[in-house]
From Swiss-Prot:
Top-level taxon in the UniProt lineage: Bacteria
UniProt keyword annotations, A-Z: Ribonucleoprotein, Ribosomal protein, RNA-binding, rRNA-binding, tRNA-binding
One of the GO BP terms on file: translation
Pfam family, one: Ribosomal_L16
InterPro entries, A to Z: Ribosomal_uL16, Ribosomal_uL16_bact-type, Ribosomal_uL16_CS, Ribosomal_uL16_dom, Ribosomal_uL16_sf
Protein name: Large ribosomal subunit protein uL16
Length: 142
């Protein structure tokens, strides 16, 4: 599963995923089709891995899945049955904040029908509403 190799601080503040749109990482950059979030949420490392496995199984040996989000924030929790106080709990899971219009996954090198089906299967594993976006034709600079 995805998690940072090392971080400056083990325990972090909780970041809001408010109703603002993403102004970076909201276009198809590396592939031909992309899975774009239409709502905001926290997405855990397990959910990202589950979506990646679903997409790669549908694609078979051809094509490539590009993950555009990374779970770099830690979520802490205390064990069950522990009373309040005595500090913050230990890091339990890693998550990523996904705002509206964030491009989460991209695929390249396969037929359009297979690409859309693979992204659809991956999207059903995630806790956000999503849509499939096609890459805009690149303009050649002369």
């Amino acid at each position: 599963m995805l998690q940072p190799k090392r971080t400056k601080h083990r325990k972090m503040f909780r970041i809001r995923h408010d109703k603002k749109d993403a102004f970076k990482g909201n276009k198809v950059s590396f592939g031909e089709y992309g899975l774009q979030a239409t709502t905001s949420a926290w997405i855990t490392a397990r959910q990202i891995e589950s979506a990646r496995i679903a997409a790669t199984r549908r694609m078979g040996r051809e094509g490539q899945v590009i993950i555009r989000i990374f779970p770099h924030l830690s979520k802490t929790s205390k064990p069950i049955g522990v009373r309040m106080g005595s500090g913050k709990g230990s890091p339990e899971k890693w998550y990523s904040v996904v705002k509206r219009q964030t491009m989460m996954f991209e695929v390249s090198g396969i037929k359009p029908e297979v690409a859309k089906d693979a992204l659809r299967l991956a999207g059903h594993k995630l806790p956000v509403k999503w849509r499939i976006v096609e890459a805009s034709p690149k303009e050649e600079v002369i």
